[in-house]
Amino acid sequence: MISTVALFWALFLVCVINMARYFSSLRALLVVLRGCDPLLYQYVDGGGFFTAHGQPSKQIRLVWYIYWQRYLDHHDDEFIRRCERVRRQFILTSALCGLVIISLIGLMIWH
């Protein structure tokens, strides 16, 4: 029989790996954004996005821009593809994080 604790840690590891993939894709998206749309890059604080002095309100703007698919009207196909990838990874990572939290609650009740 599979240990529930081992299953939880495996799920947690998959979630962390997907988070790393998401942040890597987001960084690549910002590089593409800097080249194809400098105004949007500054609007979402692309230069300070992953720094300690980054502005969370501007970072949230990029998240909502991608989540609501406002990039579909953009002129650059590479940017659209990157946004689609980041959006899919965001949804996957959010679902996995939710599953990890539910699993943790289940483990606390079970054990």
Swiss-Prot record:
Q: Name one GO cellular component term.
A: plasma membrane
How does the protein associate with the membrane? Multi-pass membrane protein
Pfam families named among the record's database cross-references: UspB (PF10625)
Q: What keyword terms does UniProt attach to this protein? A: Cell inner membrane, Cell membrane, Membrane, Transmembrane, Transmembrane helix
Its recorded name reads Universal stress protein B
Instruction: Keyword check for Transmembrane helix, yes or no.
Output: yes
Q: Where the protein is mainly located, per its record?
A: membrane
Q: Report the family membership.
A: Belongs to the universal stress protein B family.
Tell me the NCBIfam families matching this sequence: PRK04960.1
The record's listing under InterPro entries reads: Universal_stress_protein_B
Origin organism is: Cronobacter sakazakii (strain ATCC BAA-894)
* Keyword field contains Transmembrane helix: yes
